[in-house]
A protein has these predicted regions:
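Conserved catalytic-core motifs of GNAT/GCN5-like acyltransferases
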Residues: 90, 108-123
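Conserved GNAT acetyl-CoA-binding A-motif
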Residues: 80-91
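Conserved N-terminal entry element of GNAT/NAT acetyltransferase domains
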Residues: 1-8, 131-137
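C-terminal "cap" of GNAT-fold acetyltransferases
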Residues: 116-137
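Conserved active-site alpha-helix within GNAT-family acetyltransferase domains
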Residues: 94-111
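Acetyl-CoA-dependent GNAT
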Residues: 6-53, 63-64
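Conserved acetyl-CoA pyrophosphate-binding loop and the N-cap/start of the following alpha-helix
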Residues: 66-74
Length: 137
């Protein structure tokens, strides 16, 4: 059984930080954790909220928690609670699993930051609310 942790963002962030790449801005963030048998197995970290956009990073050590109901929950948080019109992600070009996941969720490749992950490029992905297949219209 998976338990969603929404009220302990600092513990979730401490678990996720060593597993994340890039220059994440931790000043204002939200983090949801996913526990199995009392151990964190996944986290979704939201940073760089601008009102219209929010950056998302996903960390997992066990994909058992990645189900439709949790995906829908995350999109509802971004688009309904935060009121964003888009969601963004930045991924190392060598992270094929994350790229496949983002494309499967409906994200579109929007650009490339050359040598962002020294020496690898960063690929910028985005998704508009109007493109989101996970929310009811």
């Amino acid at each position: 059984m998976i338990e969603v942790i929404t009220d302990d963002k600092h513990r979730v962030a401490e678990w996720a930080k060593p597993k994340l790449e890039g220059n994440i801005q931790w000043a204002n963030f939200q983090a949801f954790g996913f526990e199995r048998h009392g151990d964190l197995v996944g986290a979704v970290v939201f940073t760089e909220y601008t009102g219209n956009d929010i950056h998302v990073s996903v960390v997992t050590t066990d994909p058992c928690w990645w189900h439709r109901r949790y995906i829908k929950l995350l999109y509802e948080y971004v688009f309904d609670q935060c009121g964003c019109i888009r969601i963004s992600a930045l991924v190392n070009e060598s992270n094929r699993k994350s790229i496949k996941l983002l494309r499967g969720l409906g994200f579109k490749e929007e650009g490339r930051l050359r040598s962002y992950f020294n020496p690898k490029d960063g690929i910028v992905f985005g998704q508009l609310r109007s493109e989101c297949k996970w929310l009811e219209r």
